[in-house]
């Protein structure tokens, strides 16, 4: 199957086995989600995604207090992957991330490390063209597209797409970009994958609460790793592995969880002792 993405100045062809439009999306992950697509392991999928505001922000007058916050962070899907079941991992390789032409960033009241210096609320519109993000006439920088939300159905209950956890979700990891593979534990049959929250660029830390929030098109490949369940999502790049840990309110505990997952990976996959893993991560690992 071939699908096409129309861009200014031409048309980009997506060679994919399947396609899902952006209006097929969810606002929360749960075992009760009805899949919109069923695919085999190894399939490629072209997904359209909304920006995190679901099209509500078009001008700098569209500030956060004017938005319907129930319509934030939609995730395209869910996708049922045949053969995926608890005890496995689902690997999602990001082959392409093509943002649209306009995105937005915000200052949100009572949010972020510089809120005491900035006037809130505020919105800035960014234009994206030829791989460059333009903030204004004086400021531009290279686009580094990434996906904030990549997740599967959790073991129990319902988790909003705004949150992150062992199921993935709103990880906002800027390494979840083209060329990376995100490995996630499977908790429900079929995994029930959903993806969204594209950014044309996002700083590590996303200190105002937003990146360049933008819609666009994504090409992914899904693979089931039988009997190799991770405890937390792991992002694999060409030269590194990035582990994740999440808590509600304790940064040190989140760091501990991410470190434990990294050490476990070294012990199980490379034969490290826990002592060697501890020392290696201290001398060659980064916490972010």
Language model regions located:
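Conserved mixed alpha/beta catalytic, RNA-binding, or beta-rich assembly cores of soluble enzyme
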Residues: 143-252, 263
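N-terminal, Lys/Arg-enriched amphipathic/low-complexity engagement segments
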Residues: 17-67
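Bacterial Sec-dependent signal peptides at the C-terminal "C-region" and cleavage site
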Residues: 3-15
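A generic structural signal for residues embedded in beta-strands
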Residues: 47, 89-92, 184
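Short, structured beta-strand/loop micro-motifs enriched in basic residues and often containing a Trp
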Residues: 21-30, 68-76, 159-167
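Short, Lys/Arg- and Gly-enriched loop/turn segments at beta-strand edges
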Residues: 52-63, 97-107, 190-200
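Intrinsically disordered, low-complexity linker/loop segments enriched in Gly/Pro
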Residues: 96-178
């Amino acid at each position: 199957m071939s699908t096409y993405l129309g861009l200014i100045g031409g048309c980009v062809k997506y060679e994919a086995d399947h396609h899902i439009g952006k209006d097929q999306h969810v606002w929360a992950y749960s075992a009760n989600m009805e899949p919109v697509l069923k695919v085999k392991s190894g399939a490629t999928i072209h997904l359209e995604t909304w920006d995190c505001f679901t099209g509500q922000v078009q001008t700098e007058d569209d500030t956060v207090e004017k938005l319907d916050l129930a319509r934030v962070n939609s995730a395209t899907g869910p996708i049922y992957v045949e053969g995926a079941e608890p005890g496995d991992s689902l690997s999602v390789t990001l082959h392409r991330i093509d943002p649209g032409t306009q995105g937005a960033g915000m200052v949100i009241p009572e949010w972020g490390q510089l809120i005491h210096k900035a006037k809130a609320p505020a919105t800035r519109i960014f234009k994206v063209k030829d791989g460059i993000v333009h903030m204004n006439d004086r400021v531009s920088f290279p686009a580094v597209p990434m996906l904030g939300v990549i997740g599967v159905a959790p073991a129990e209950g319902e988790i909003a797409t705004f949150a992150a956890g062992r199921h993935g979700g709103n990880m906002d990891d800027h390494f979840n970009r083209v060329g990376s593979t995100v490995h996630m534990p499977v908790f429900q049959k079929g995994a029930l994958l959903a993806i969204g929250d594209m950014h044309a660029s996002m700083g590590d830390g996303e200190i105002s609460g937003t990146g360049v929030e933008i819609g666009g098109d994504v090409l992914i490949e899904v693979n089931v790793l039988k009997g190799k369940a991770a405890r937390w999502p792991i992002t694999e790049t060409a030269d590194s592995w990035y582990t994740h840990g999440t808590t509600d309110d304790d940064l040190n505990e989140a760091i501990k969880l991410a470190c434990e997952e990294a050490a476990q990976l070294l012990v199980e996959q490379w034969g490290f002792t826990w002592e060697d893993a501890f020392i290696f991560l201290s001398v060659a690992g980064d916490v972010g």
